[in-house]
């Protein structure tokens, strides 16, 4: 009896591990389950809605999501930009492309959403731009060269355009300290890639979600600020 329980527990651990390993690149049956978990876990839904609200997307905005998963944030963004804006998304998982396309079928048919299978280090030329806003939720840790890729994304942002990067550490034993450290690392990456930091927000989940907001510097606004700044007395 004890041996049967141990075998059952071992199988359960193996199944859970297989699903967890799928979150970076969902595929096959386990990937389908991972997509279902991402779409239906209440904390994920709350997290995505919160990040979109922080980005303050406006009607007519052109918005890009990197790593859209099952398409929850894409759906929220499409509602916010309305008929005059457009939402783009890339994800390197064919499974997530199918799930997100089904979830956003009406917006895609209406020409308001465009989803593409592509990794962040191979942005397709057809992606368009410049964008008013870019966001990514829990995908940065899978990027191979984050500073370089953030710099490439910044070049797709209009001057003054903003980016939101959210992280909710899912490693075993993650705490508020883990989230805080993740925020500091993301802030450093953004500054190294040429962004101007705006602010960092925290959502009180377990573990906490951090969202770092930054902007692509606007050269004209910077020049105006420098002209208006008081000159030191000679």
Name every feature range the model reports, one short phrase each.
Residues 121-134:
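A short acidic, Gly/Pro-enriched loop at the edge of an enzyme's catalytic core
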Residues 178-193:
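Short alpha-helix
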Residues 147-159:
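A short glycine-rich, Lys/Arg-flanked "PGG" loop and its adjoining helix->strand segment in the class I
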Residues 133-146:
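A short SAM/SAH-binding and catalytic strip from SAM-dependent methyltransferases
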Residues 64-122:
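Class I SAM-dependent methyltransferase SAM/SAH-binding core
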Residues 42-61:
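Conserved alpha-helix/loop element of class I SAM-dependent methyltransferases that forms part
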Residues 160-168:
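Conserved beta-strand signature within the Rossmann-like core of class I S-adenosyl-L-methionine
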């Amino acid at each position: 009896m004890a041996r049967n329980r141990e075998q059952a527990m071992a199988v359960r651990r193996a199944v859970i591990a297989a699903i967890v390993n799928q979150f970076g690149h969902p595929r096959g049956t386990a990937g389908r389950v991972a997509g279902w978990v991402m779409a239906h876990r209440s904390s994920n839904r709350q997290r995505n809605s919160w990040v979109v609200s922080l980005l303050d997307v406006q009607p007519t905005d052109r918005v890009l999501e990197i790593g859209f998963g099952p398409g929850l944030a894409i759906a929220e963004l499409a509602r916010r930009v309305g008929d005059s804006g457009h939402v783009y998304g890339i994800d390197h998982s064919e499974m997530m492309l199918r799930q997100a396309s089904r979830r956003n079928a009406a917006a895609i048919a209406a020409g308001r959403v465009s989803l593409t299978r592509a990794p962040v280090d191979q942005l397709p030329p057809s992606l368009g731009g410049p964008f008013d806003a870019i966001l990514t939720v829990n995908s940065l840790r899978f990027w191979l060269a984050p500073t370089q890729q953030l710099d490439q994304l910044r070049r797709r942002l209009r001057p003054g355009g903003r980016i939101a990067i959210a992280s909710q550490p899912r490693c075993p034993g993650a705490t508020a300290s883990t989230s805080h450290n993740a925020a500091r690392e993301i802030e450093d990456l953004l500054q190294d890639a040429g962004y101007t930091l705006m602010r960092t927000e925290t959502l009180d989940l377990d573990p906490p979600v951090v969202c770092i907001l930054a902007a692509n510097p606007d050269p004209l606004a910077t020049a105006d600020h420098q002209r208006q700044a008081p000159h030191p007395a000679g």
